[in-house]
Amino acid sequence: MLSDLRYALRMLVKSPAFTAVAVITLALGIGANTAIFSVVEGTLLRPLPFPHAERLVVIYETLVENDARAAANALSDRTLTRFREFGRDIFEDVAGATYRIVAVGLNDGSPLQAARATGVTSNFFDVVGLPPAKGRNFSSEEARAGASAVVIVSDDFWRNTLNRRDDVLGRTLVVDGTPRTIIGVMPKAFRYPIRAQMWLPLVLEPNNPTTRNNHYLYGVARLRPGVTAAKAEGAVKRMCAASNRDDPDPANARAAYMLPLRESFVMDLRPKLLVIVAAAVCALLIAATNFAGLLLARVVEREGELALRAALGASRRRLVRQQLVQALLLAVIGTAFGLLIASWITPMLFALSPEASDFGGGVMREFDSAPRLDLPVFAFAAGVMALVGLGFGLLPAMRASRTDLRAAISATARGATLDRGARRLLASFVVIELAIAAALLTASVTATQYFRKLIEEPWGFETKDRLGFNVAVPDGFFPTAMAKQAALENSLAQLRTVPGVESATVVSPSPMGASWSLMEFNAEGAPAPEPSGVYTAYARVPVPGYFAAMGQPLLQGRDFRESDTADAPLVCIVSQSIAKRFWPNESPIGKRIKWGRLDAERPWSTVVGVVGDSKAIGDPGDGEVPGMIARPLSQMLAQATAPLFNITFVLHTNGRAITEATIRSALARANPNLAARNFWSMDDAAAQSHATERFIFVLVSAFAFLGLVLAAIGLYGLLALQVARRQREFGIRSALGATARQIIELVAWQCAALLSLGFTAGALATYGMVRLVRNQWAEMPAPNFIAWICAAIVLGVAMMIASWLPARRAARVDPVVALRAE
């Protein structure tokens, strides 16, 4: 074996051009796939940082059984408590969490800062199985009303805000006006759930009649060993049925839906990642096929030498082994360079990915999901190396073991053309490469069309010269609805005086990132849908003047007024799609909407206005508009039994740059107890909102370009070899009167035949792949006629360029030189 390795090294050194092309081909294919695998490994395969994470499930409440899309409702205190009490044979334990923005003071004289806080039940970290890295967990006593105020902080908060103080345990933070003692620091990169910066003990009130049906808890449970998902689903359904029987109010009836913890993060991302993986595998197949074609062409050139060695005693097994060793050596070198390429492009992939964007739908930012070249990635690269080196090197190696000396020497004689078997085999390799390249190009054009449609789709409001930021309005400083409203109004007044600000407004939740804020409602005169009993729409809670400040057109009726106070009749504004859906042939002004079911004891709100439709980050890509219902902030603050989420200020500027410090200063003048965070330009947010689709578009296009280049190299290699072997034929044709143009056309027709076969096969493969992908990702568009035509043109032009040099070489064959051997 060592002698075979030395022989392979000598042969590679003697043929530097062949070696360079083979290594570059493999490096590009393996490097790209290794980088993609690092992303997939970090997102889909890397174990979660919990013991027996496969037993962790997320529980939702829903009005439609077994409907994951309708399972946006969180748990109530009552439901979570019942699951704990009656699910002991299924769950080891059930925990809950809720999210809010808090104002944090460091007791060092610095201004308040906003932070993401998660209130968790005292058993939360026990359920997930991850204790603090420093300090201790919450005790059950600390999750009771009136208990000592404590907090656990994230590693990021400890490092970046508390400056990695060694004496962090026992220090005091003022959270929403309440001094809290730090009792723990969580492990590095742990921010679960909802990218938390700190965790507070959560007090449940399952028997409080005013809050028992507030669905605000994120529920996570650990299954008992041996409990299957099907058994757990059945038990949860039975518990929900029993709970519904005990509560005669049909408005409270709920079903439940469970998902494995990892699945809850990646169920929407998986099919999109699989599209990228498929494109990467296609590029690898082109590279591997090209590699096999290079090896086969090399064997064809050396057939005489190999046959002579066989005649002198070299066994067939020895010849095959030497060729496989050479192929494997090339694969090793190509993989080494591929890993270098992967190490270079992996950070670029992460920068492009949704995980690096605040508005791009990143799903794994609670954990360490950054792609990196670790042991699983190296193992993947080694597996690909072995597959390519041995699998794709076997056929050329078998060809090298042909032992017919006379046939081999005749085939390599001057003027001899390629035999039919070699010609067909090499042509088959090129057709395969062209087919895969055609599929990739078609997918790339389709992705381009889809991405362009997304970015050109209007938001329904203006994003130009709009700045947004979130604020925390803590109960500790603002205990009443009037206090909260006064703080927000004073802040608006101060912000409107900032130079460069033309208008300022407030809304909850964020106008762009609210696709998760679905509300349940019924419209007067419309039958309740079955079986859920409710419709859903996006919720908005703005101040008067919000729609004008955002440039969202008022189509009918009026905007909210200052007189729409807590004591005034309840009013709402609906979007155009809601109006058309429920009152298509009449004016919606004066109609009424009720939150929840029709038979629920809740007040009606009167529709006073209709605005244009708008979209939100995370909307389905099929163009369906869910609709929006807005309620005035003053009425919601007075009536809400749960806090408003993501209270967002939006500033409309005259184009002048306004700094974060200027905004903070204006807020501090209005009220020093308001803390702001998460400043962003709405234009930037709009650009980042399609980070997932952009990621797919960029990578599929990159792989299509890579496949196109490799396919062109493969076609060039085949035509160059055939032209070299057909010099005698071209010489005879020239001697008999064939012009250079006719000979070029002869080579071009051969190229066109291969291209036609390849594109036809690629079209069939694309059709099958699209149907497969759309089973998992319904929004994935099918290629249209324009996509096919564009792919055909690009592929045709590239192949014309690849065939031009061999065709010119064929046209310049000197008949005298070509026939001299005769």
Locate the predicted segments by residue:
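Membrane-helix entry/capping segments
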Residues: 1-21, 50, 72, 111, ...
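Short, strongly hydrophobic transmembrane alpha-helices
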Residues: 15-43, 286-289, 331-336, 426-450, ...
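Small-residue-rich transmembrane alpha-helices
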Residues: 36, 292, 328-405, 449, ...
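Mid-to-C-terminal secondary-structure elements
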Residues: 102, 116-140, 148-274, 347-353, ...
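Alpha-helical transmembrane segments
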Residues: 28-62, 296, 346-356, 436-465, ...
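Alpha-helical transmembrane segments of integral membrane proteins
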Residues: 1-19, 261-266, 295-321, 325, ...
